[in-house]
Amino acid sequence: MAPQKHGSGGNGFYGNSASKAANGGAHASSGVVMTSVKRLKMEQIQADHQLFLEAFEKPTQIYRFLRTRNLITPIFLHRSLTYMSHRNSRTNSKRKSFSLNDLLFKVEKSKVDPESHNLASNLQLTFTGFFHKTEKQLQNSENEENSVSVEVLLVKLCHKKRKDVTCPVKQVPTGKKQVPLNPDISPTKLGAFPTLVVPSHEFEPVNSNTVKSYSLLFRASRPWGREHNGMTTRDTNVIEELSNRKKRYCSHQDDGETTFVAQMTVFDKNRRLQLLDGEYEVSMQEIEESPVGKKRATWETILDEKWVPPFETFSQGPTLQFTLRWTNDTADKATAPVAKPLATRNSESSTVDSSKTSNIKPPQAVAVNDSLGTDLPVRREQTHIEPCQKLHVYYQFLYNNNTRQQTEARDDLHCPWCTLNCRKLYSLLKHLKLSHSRFIFNYVPHPKGARIDVSINECYDGSYVGNPQDILCQPGFAFSRNGPVKRTPVTQILVCRPKRSKPSLSEFLEPEDGEQEQQRTYISGHNRLYFHSDSCTPLRPQEMEVDSEDERDPDWLREKTAMQIEEFTDVNEGEKEIMKLWNLLVMKHGFIADNQMNQACMSFVEQHGTIMVEKNLCRNALLHLINMHDFGLITTATIDKAMTHLRDLTQQSIAQH
């Protein structure tokens, strides 16, 4: 409309050109406005995303810190929780038949019967071959050795004593075998290969030193020259440039022999078995290649054409292949020792034949089927028939009722914040709800597993509920406690415990009415810090029961009372001493009522009777008691008892002298 108004005052040409110019300016201005709007939207999105990260960052850091602190000083054991009962491997079924008289019989039977020993299995090693590829074959193939001498030593790492600087190590030779070099891979029976057996008694603890861990040391040696040690051309050039110091370091070996070593742990320091039945291929390392001086570890980018020794080991060698079995002397059956291996992330219990890992069923699918409501028997039948699959768990983070981020699928049931292996979906959700209440977790069924919506709990009470004294202590006070300490008194709300419902995933579903569960504090107590009135130091929890303001007889008040009595002029010295003792007694015990005077007089002669006898104050004490009787505070019976006690003390004093 504006161009039409300007064009009406002149010719048509001017009005037409003005309208075109105005239309062009309008298009240009609209483009600028659109760009600014997009820029504002992007800035708003970035700012909103930054707020989302900040909202989830603080609780995550708090829970990571709590995880580390609970690992150092745990407050409770997760296996003792009701929803974590599957983590407790111990059962109380044997307690009913337990008898204290049977302990000696069981110990004697375990010593006599060798078959009842925990480690009654022998370690059998069947060597398949020693593989070491060379870049060029030797010219004199007639003299070439087709076998390698392999020696196996059992290394026992013992506990360090006070006088020892390092842990004592014992090497027990178990045997030496000739292993074929670079054999052809063909289905040959294990009986055709050299076999070595480590007896079971070698794994028994030693009397002098308690063994901490057991490991196997493989030492392979081959009589060949240094120029034909199986390395490539550039490796030979590198080895030829060794310094004289390194050559002297390796002078214990012959010039025509090269030795390779490798070590594998059998039992770790926790007595857990690390080597199960199966076929192994271990990478051997030449002794001469070990560096003399220490080098700093650095990060390095691996290129496609670059030769990397650790990755080329299993393709070029040297490697030693062998089959490991745990066997008995009587029967040649593979029986694993009682020491349990390291549990896998998705297996609830370890099986005996651990080489067949495909038969192990993960417990996640069973947990889902066991926890869902009405069609429980049908789904349990399907669980036994169909093979169990891994349960994929997705975490979807919500902020302002909008999805901000979704994690990749996890095939385990570990808590993302404290890395606790819950092993079951119900246990994971229960743990997240109770242990990480700064967030709100809602379970959503997913076709491939489960989805957990995570949002910030706005109703969380984040006030400090611990000891206020810890705030003023050093930062490392929580890590330096040697034992439990007394906390401030708290009040716990008594609630009715209804009949415990069966575990069900429906309790973690999002409520239909949209109202979030209100989190409230069920334990209330003192979170204020109090101070002593005289020293201005913080009041400790063990001092809360004593009123700091109720200072009846501090040292300064006792001294001031004695000085005031000394200033009296109308009484004699004996009466002054009786007044001092009586006033200090009343200040200490806080006698304030008339009915307490009989007890006060008896306490007076019992506590200070010896002093009154030594200073000859018995008559002054009698006058004091009579004076109190005149005022109606004590009875004559109290006077008789008190004076009888003083006379007994006087006779004892005379008898001693």
Swiss-Prot record:
Recorded GO CC terms: ESC/E(Z) complex; nucleus; RSC-type complex
Localization per Swiss-Prot or TrEMBL: Nucleus
Instruction: Assign the protein's first listed, main location to one coarse class.
Output: nucleus
Where does this protein come from, organism-wise? Danio rerio (Zebrafish)
Q: What does this protein do?
A: Polycomb group (PcG) protein. Component of the prc2/eed-ezh2 complex, which methylates 'Lys-9' and 'Lys-27' of histone H3, leading to transcriptional repression of the affected target gene.
Entry's Gene Ontology molecular function annotations:
chromatin DNA binding; zinc ion binding
Q: What keywords tag this UniProt record?
A: Chromatin regulator, Metal-binding, Nucleus, Repressor, Transcription, Transcription regulation, Zinc, Zinc-finger
Q: Which family does it belong to?
A: Belongs to the VEFS (VRN2-EMF2-FIS2-SU(Z)12) family.
Name this polypeptide is given: Polycomb protein suz12-A
Could you provide one GO biological process annotation from this protein's UniProt record?
A: chromatin organization
Composition bias, Low complexity: 347-358
Region Disordered, residue ranges? 335-363
Provide the gene name from the record.
suz12a
Q: Where is this region: VEFS-box?
A: 528-604
Classification via Pfam families: VEFS-Box, Zn_SUZ12
> Can you state the subunit structure given in the record?
Component of the prc2/eed-ezh2 complex.
| Membrane-spanning ranges | none
- Zinc finger spans (C2H2-type)? 413-436
